[in-house]
From Swiss-Prot:
Family: Belongs to the TRAFAC class translation factor GTPase superfamily. Classic translation factor GTPase family. PrfC subfamily.
Protein name: Peptide chain release factor 3
Primary subcellular site in the record, as a coarse category: cytoplasm
Organism: Geobacter sulfurreducens (strain ATCC 51573 / DSM 12127 / PCA)
The keyword GTP-binding is annotated on this UniProt entry: yes
Domain tr-type G: residue ranges: 9-277
Highest taxon of the lineage: Bacteria
Length: 526
């Protein structure tokens, strides 16, 4: 018998991915609106009134209007429990986004109809493809003059190398935007920017020959008929199996800022998106229908509540049932812990959770003992795979302005590195820390947070490193390597040896000279 079958099958856990400014935060809020999780969308337009978007809660995000950290939100829709993970909307945060995508079962891609496929979308889709993540697509901003919908579909197929299966089709755009026609339910949804939730009515049609179509749309009715005829000949029909395999993306059109088209997307999402999927571990595959509890940490966030100076570890439940107060085994440390204060999130608002099931994301207070990739079980030594650290591409040396703050600097850098958006390196020789990041914006984030959350003022100095490699091998050889290459050897935040190279040539040369050692470009979270 499948354990918790009903609870598992009604869960949907997904992330929203897009290029900055495609409307990701807006669609997040509209989904929460339909789920009854918020009463009023804090749209970006209302930011001047200091009602910042619900999911962008960190100070720096509020200033810049981009999601810098990924937050977790939960809502109920049509008896489905939906866990929505917002991902960073800035291209410097690919590493954090990658880890968020390890915790979800599917993704929603938001594309700006004016701009089409953008660079960040391509990167994010590559990450989804690595994991065969099923993707649904929402083409946004139909209330503006955008690109031809056929052209957009063609671009998605060619650039992102994924089949498109249009589910709804737009009638006009910009000033001529009248609504969408659902190709499968035959419903016509009329757009009305003044109406509540952007919808002037949902009209069931017998098909495209229905005379109501001409009455409502006038000359645009024939345009719609011609478009649909073309689609029937050229577009891919929706196939759930191809969607689940990550080979096909169902496509919806709408205007998130007007809440238009969002409900059609949400209905299809809960009906067709996968329920919690099995998870790969080192020793075996873990089914969501197993009775023993398992979960892994995919994200750590410091100072979510400045009043409490707290750190929260986000866990994805993979199997079994979580109940408040239960004792679990922290596999890496080999010790038993009781979880009394797990929380679920609605962006910054959090509530204590009494029970949770596979697919759910829970937050657990972390006093420095939980690291990304850690597993909690009821006793079995399981380690889930595929949660990596990437080698940084940018480096800065940190110079402290007040020498008396060195302990606070160490604490700040270590805690921020635990979140996984930056990495810290302590030299084997010398005292100055080096911060490594996959993207440049992360350096600003570290400085800002050191000052505002740890009361540490520091500056950066350029440092001539271009990449890092983690070094492993026989103990004697590693010790010999450390002596010979001491100027380039560092210890990372996890206590592992890293070699920082000043050029690709230098790295290649060092690897040639030390063939007995292994140089790793990524490191699994241990």
């Amino acid at each position: 018998m499948k354990y918790n079958e009903q609870e598992v099958d009604r869960r949907r856990t997904f992330a929203i991915v897009s290029h900055p400014d495609a409307g990701k935060t807006t669609i997040t809020e509209k989904l929460l609106l339909f789920g009854g999780a918020i009463q009023q969308a804090g749209e970006v337009r209302a930011r001047k009134a200091a009602r910042h978007a619900t999911s962008d809660w960190m100070e720096m995000e509020k200033q810049r209007g981009i999601s810098v950290t990924s937050s977790v939100m939960k809502f109920t829709y049509r008896d489905y429990e939906v866990n929505l993970l917002d991902t960073p909307g800035h291209n410097d945060f690919s590493e954090d986004t990658y880890r968020v995508l390890t915790a979800v079962d599917s993704a929603l891609m938001v594309i700006d109809s004016v701009k089409g496929v953008e660079s960040q979308t391509i990167k994010l889709l590559d990450v989804c493809r690595l994991r065969h993540t099923p993707i649904m697509t929402f083409i946004n901003k139909l209330d503006r003059e955008g690109r031809d919908p056929f052209e957009l579909i063609d671009e998605i197929e060619k650039v992102l190398r994924i089949q498109c299966a249009p589910m709804t089709w737009p009638i006009g755009m910009g000033k001529r935007f009248r609504g969408t026609y659902h190709l499968y339910t035959k419903e016509l949804v009329i757009f009305d920017a003044e109406a509540e939730r952007g919808t002037g009515g949902v009209i069931s049609m017998t098909g495209l020959d229905d005379p109501q179509l001409d009455e409502l749309l006038g000359s645009q009715a024939d345009e719609l008929r011609a478009d649909v005829e073309l689609l029937e000949g050229a577009a891919h029909p929706f196939e759930e199996e191809a969607y689940h395999a990550g080979l096909q993306t169902p496509v919806f059109f709408g205007s998130a800022i007007n809440t238009f088209g969002v409900q059609q997307l949400l209905d299809t999402f809960v009906d067709h998106a996968p329920a919690p999927l099995p998870r790969e571990a080192v020793s075996r595959t873990v089914s969501p229908y197993e009775e023993p509890f398992t979960a892994f940490a995919f994200k750590i966030q410091a100072n979510m509540d400045p009043a409490h100076r707290d750190r929260i570890a986000f866990f994805r439940i993979c199997s079994g049932k979580f109940t408040r107060g239960m004792k679990v085994r922290h596999v890496r440390l080999g010790r038993e812990v009781a979880i009394n204060n797990a929380t679920i999130f609605m962006a910054q608002d959090r509530t204590h959770v009494d029970e949770a099931f596979p697919g759910d994301i829970i937050g657990i207070h972390n006093h420095g003992t939980i690291k990304i990739g850690d597993t909690f079980t009821l006793g079995e030594d399981i380690k889930f795979t595929g949660i990596p650290n990437f080698a940084p591409e940018h480096f800065r040396r940190v110079r402290l302005l007040d020498p008396l703050k060195s302990k606070a600097l160490e604490k700040g850098l270590t805690q921020l590195a635990e979140e996984g958006t930056t990495q810290v390196f302590r030299p084997l020789m010398g005292a100055d820390w080096v911060v490594g990041a996959v993207g440049l914006l992360q350096f600003d984030v570290v400085m800002h947070r050191l000052e505002h959350e740890y009361n540490v003022k520091a500056t950066y100095e350029p440092v001539s490193y271009v990449t890092a490699r983690w070094v492993t091998g026989e103990k004697k050889k590693v010790e010999e390597f450390q002596k010979k290459e001491v100027m380039n050897c560092y210890i990372d935040g996890e206590g592992d040896l890293a070699y920082l190279a000043g050029s690709q040539w230098r790295l290649d040369n060092t690897m040639d000279n030390w063939k007995d050692l292994t140089f790793h470009a990524t490191r699994e979270h241990s």
